[in-house]
Amino acid sequence: MALFEDIQAVIAEQLNVDAAQVTPEAEFVKDLGADSLDVVELIMALEEKFNIEIPDEQAEKIVNVGDVVKYIEDNKLA
């Protein structure tokens, strides 16, 4: 599950939270204390780290860590 660990590290760094808090069910705003700007910056960091593009309409649907993992798994090799 190296992908999850990579994503977890990016999220923990971007949101300045302990990696243990970054679980698949953790919601960025509700559980990790992110605001809308934090979420935008997080999406940009994930795009850069994984060399993908997350369109705005997809980014709006990403509310928790599991959503990010699924999106990257589904689109990284596309």
Swiss-Prot record:
<dbReference type="GO" id="GO:0009245">
    <property type="term" value="P:lipid A biosynthetic process"/>
</dbReference>
<comment type="pathway">
    <text>Lipid metabolism; fatty acid biosynthesis.</text>
</comment>
<dbReference type="InterPro" id="IPR020806">
    <property type="entry name" value="PKS_PP-bd"/>
</dbReference>
<dbReference type="InterPro" id="IPR036736">
    <property type="entry name" value="ACP-like_sf"/>
</dbReference>
<dbReference type="InterPro" id="IPR003231">
    <property type="entry name" value="ACP"/>
</dbReference>
<keyword id="KW-0597">Phosphoprotein</keyword>
<protein>
    <recommendedName>
        <fullName>Acyl carrier protein</fullName>
    </recommendedName>
</protein>
<keyword id="KW-0443">Lipid metabolism</keyword>
<dbReference type="InterPro" id="IPR009081">
    <property type="entry name" value="PP-bd_ACP"/>
</dbReference>
<dbReference type="Pfam" id="PF00550">
    <property type="entry name" value="PP-binding"/>
</dbReference>
<feature type="domain" description="Carrier">
    <location>
        <begin position="1"/>
        <end position="76"/>
    </location>
</feature>
<keyword id="KW-0963">Cytoplasm</keyword>
<keyword id="KW-0596">Phosphopantetheine</keyword>
<dbReference type="InterPro" id="IPR006162">
    <property type="entry name" value="Ppantetheine_attach_site"/>
</dbReference>
<dbReference type="GO" id="GO:0000036">
    <property type="term" value="F:acyl carrier activity"/>
</dbReference>
<comment type="similarity">
    <text>Belongs to the acyl carrier protein (ACP) family.</text>
</comment>
<dbReference type="GO" id="GO:0005829">
    <property type="term" value="C:cytosol"/>
</dbReference>
<keyword id="KW-0276">Fatty acid metabolism</keyword>
<dbReference type="GO" id="GO:0016020">
    <property type="term" value="C:membrane"/>
</dbReference>
<comment type="function">
    <text>Carrier of the growing fatty acid chain in fatty acid biosynthesis.</text>
</comment>
<keyword id="KW-0444">Lipid biosynthesis</keyword>
<feature type="modified residue" description="O-(pantetheine 4'-phosphoryl)serine">
    <location>
        <position position="36"/>
    </location>
</feature>
<dbReference type="GO" id="GO:0031177">
    <property type="term" value="F:phosphopantetheine binding"/>
</dbReference>
<dbReference type="GO" id="GO:0000035">
    <property type="term" value="F:acyl binding"/>
</dbReference>
<keyword id="KW-0275">Fatty acid biosynthesis</keyword>
